[in-house]
Amino acid sequence: MNSFLFSALFFFWLLFCSCKASSAMGNSLPVESKFTFEEENDRIKYVVSSMQGWGEKMEDAHAAILNLDDTTSTSFFGVYDGHGGAEVALYCAKQFHIELCNHEDYHNDLINALDNVFLSMDENLQQSDAWRELVIPHDNGCMYFLKAGVCAKPFPQATYTGPAYEGSTACVVVIRGNQMIVGHVGDSRCVLSRQGGLAIDLSFDHKPCTRTESERERVQNAGGRSLGLRCEQVMGNYVVKEQWVLGDFGGGDFAFKKNKDLDREKQMLVCDPDILADDITDDMEFLVIASQGLWSCVDSADVVSYIHDRLSVEGAELRVICEEVVEFGLASGENTTVILVQFKPGAFQYQLVDPAGFGTAVSNIASTSAAPAGASDTSDEGVDDAATARPTVMGYDADSSTGSADATVDSDEVDPNATADSYNPRGHAEIVASHTDDEVYTSGSARVESGELAVPTPSANNTVADEVKVDAAVVAGGSTTAMAADEATVVSLLSTIVDNYYSINTSEEPARRLIPLPLSQPTTRFINININAENARMTYIVKRREYFLVKSSCRCGGRHQQREVTSGGAGVEHGSIGDVPPSIRRAGRWMEKGRRRGRRAGSKYAKKEEEEGASCHAGCRHFVPEIGPWSEATIPENPRLPNSDENDMDAGGEEAKQERHLVLAHELFLLSRPDLDDLANVALRSDALDAVKSDGMAPLFESLATAGVLLKPDDAAARRDARADRRGGPQARRE
């Protein structure tokens, strides 16, 4: 009897160990069957593919909707990576875009609407369990029997507490006109491919291992600990919950947000999204939106390079490529979902968008004499309705990891005035998720196109700020007034973009509007800057009441550099694409020293590296350092591009001409927004320089110098020598 009991116990112990071993990976064998769907219109083509892989169950969800409404030509793509269950991710996939459509700012301020929807989704999960009706099947006979028979007298309603340890990431892309908005929380990622297969991260993963000191302090104050990739909730000496969370999206995880003594933004996990906006240009090839299952195995550059080669070199179909990329995620042991969005050639001609928030697209504003040949108004660009005549709404069954349920919705059945509970925009929806961060980083981009700049003639009795500035109304009206020679065409720096499109807010209220600036590497926390003499660009980042300007114009041999945009650090984070010159490596060592020893020590090392001939760091005279309320006298009084003295304006050579045009645009923007002062370089765009057909700049510069905007050569030399003396004396002067 005892031997039989021992054998039985031993058998159950072996069975338990085998189950535990198999559950560690999810399944004994991966589920490699894929769900794939594709659709296209005259602007874009997308393919979505998802696979359970080694995951114990499918917890990813996604939404792909080619035409979100009937009036604005808006497309929506979202990936939601659930953890602790698929319910929160599935709810986001079914409801996020509906909440966005029903938001009051959807038509007038899409950026603000997207930002608010992230927060409202979290609140909906916390306050009511009505969301479960969207993800739990209604045709379950057992549930119906229990409700109708056994539970004829239902038990008293328990207090709703929300999903304690379930949550989801979110990475969504909204395309309207020729504008693209990316919002994300968590470790799902969106990557852009530019011409030639250049990978650009449009989102930055929110992970505890990348937390800043302020974030770690917030977690500790809320009663938790941030240990690498883990967040633990601690009570006394006991760890009552150990949750592997690779992100902070507040869609669920309310066990980490229940400290009643703290505000929402001070909880252990928060739900503040990163929002980025950018123009869609002809050099953009495709977007890759994927869950963490893909990015934990391969990096962004490898994925983009593979897709680019398969598309352009081998000519493979987008559907086949998407399924191949999904298989890369098998090694992660997790679910994998990938959405590929391909931009069709010539579909996105440049348009100015309603400054109120991506409302109605209008054609590029250019003066009548400087309008480029063949330019036309594309504001009424249509959408192929035939491709969406009978759209479908699809989603995973909550009880099945591979099954799907289909429903067809006729377009005439959609009530545009319906509420969020009843209005289901046409499109294709499924399962996926994300996590967040407590700091909002936003960035965006805008291009400056060719046209003539209207500059009123300055008066000797008036100041530059009062008189010498761009007349936005005249420019918008197409006036051809200019101070340059008749044959000269001047870069149009439409001040309406800065005045209306931005909201530069230095008050206590955080800035919510994005600043549309050209991005060479538009990520949210780190900016990879392409240092190229023929492609000088800059990026402006907003971080809660702090503003930073990063400008790439260095021509001292460096190819790429990565700058860390934080208010307390030394200001630079080393990173590279391709070959890195020794000067960059030395700068990287200086950066580490600067972070360890503080800003003052960093400045000392900057000076030391400069004396040794290093460049491409904050001490480099070819680089304008970041600009913000915290920065002090480290910024030149009048930052300029290298070799920008007015007495060099008549020098020959194509490179010198381009440099003169760049300086011209820099100075003209000073005229348009004198109140911005050091932010004068904000609206520069390299491709706008190509519109400057004539080199007859002398009359214009003479007029600007008379107005006191440009320094006279002697004054410029004196100021340059003064800066050199502060930097290091005669040696720096010779440099």
From Swiss-Prot:
Binds 2 magnesium or manganese ions per subunit. Mn(2+) 2 binds at D81, Q292, E334. Residues 45-343 form the PPM-type phosphatase domain. Residues 1-26 form the signal peptide. It is an enzyme of class 3 (hydrolase). Residues 392-424, 565-584, 631-653, 712-735 are annotated as: Disordered. InterPro entries: PP2C (IPR015655), PP2C_BS (IPR000222), PPM-type-like_dom_sf (IPR036457), PPM-type_phosphatase-like_dom (IPR001932). Mn(2+) 1 binds at D81, G82. One of its GO terms (biological process) is signal transduction. Its EC number is 3.1.3.16. Its cofactor is Mg(2+); Mn(2+). GO terms for molecular function: metal ion binding; protein serine/threonine phosphatase activity. Belongs to the PP2C family. This is Probable protein phosphatase 2C 17. It comes from Oryza sativa subsp. japonica.
